[in-house]
């Protein structure tokens, strides 16, 4: 039962340089090298464990050939937190590091620039585990002989929860290997999962 929404903010950060030939222009800044330095700096940041806060560089692209000093490279950065204030603080720190990277003499004098574009944003929120909706959801699961688990996630419920409206997300089966090539769901529990979902919808009318 998802009753807490994780706040999310995502960036595409692009490094740009003049580029050049790997031999004749050796020593000229590479967008890939400069972006890699920024990745190391960002991922070295200490993040709070409570509320849980995470950072992930999930994608890197750039360059045109093995013997070319890259003139452009980009990364996609995912920031998450169960706390809105913690996410805002992390966002502030990340943006300051990007701004600082643009003002360093070693980069600015060499013609290196960094640009940050927001490519995704989801607000945080949540309702108490004691809320009637959550109690009904847990009861519907127990009726199927299963023990419910309360958790947080980034789902379609983020928007209503962030605006103070009661909302939740119910799972209908189990699985594993999320976001890997081995991701899977178990088919057998789906029948019970659908039954608990139907029972939950019916029980809402009693509120």
Regions inferred by a protein language model and the residue ranges of each:
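Metal-dependent amide/peptide-bond hydrolase catalytic core
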Residues: 2-4, 9-207
